[in-house]
Amino acid sequence: MEAHHVKSLLAVLSLIALPVMAAEPTLYGRYEYIALPEIGGQVLKAKMDTGALTASLSARDIETFKRDGEDWVRFRLGTKDASNQVYEHKIARISKIKTRSEEDEDDNEVAAPTKRPVVDLELCLGNVKRTVEVNLTDRSSFNYPLLIGAKALREFGAAVNPARRFTADKPDC
């Protein structure tokens, strides 16, 4: 009878451990390829940045407008090889971003945070697709047109190994 109780206890414990094991994050490198199904299926090199809160996509000609009483944004992809295709998305919210220069303690000048439109955008990393909040800004002076911040990393159940690069396969969603 005691062996039966031990087996039952082990069975219950293994069931309890399953969600914990399933919650183990997927390990990605500091840089990964990410597809944007809603932006013409573009595949971009992205920087996985745990120090940034939100994701940012390089965009140009960013223009907000009203459609049926709701706030929308129209933009072009801001990458070297981008076409002139115009994309339109409903605005999820407006983010207020502090730039590094605004965080400089030696600078006594108080600057207003930059306001950026945020859209809900489908991203594909490896074979995982998630909808995440992405703010639109001109990142043309940066090496990577897409920055994936901590919120999006959580959506993907991701952890980042900064010593690795491009660990996921090319996007396949």
Residue spans for each PLM region:
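Bacterial N-terminal signal peptides that target proteins for export
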Residues: 1-10
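Hydrophobic helical h-region of N-terminal Sec-dependent signal peptides
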Residues: 11-15
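N-terminal signal peptide c-region/cleavage motif recognized by signal peptidases
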Residues: 17-19
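Pepsin/retropepsin-fold aspartyl endopeptidases
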Residues: 22-173
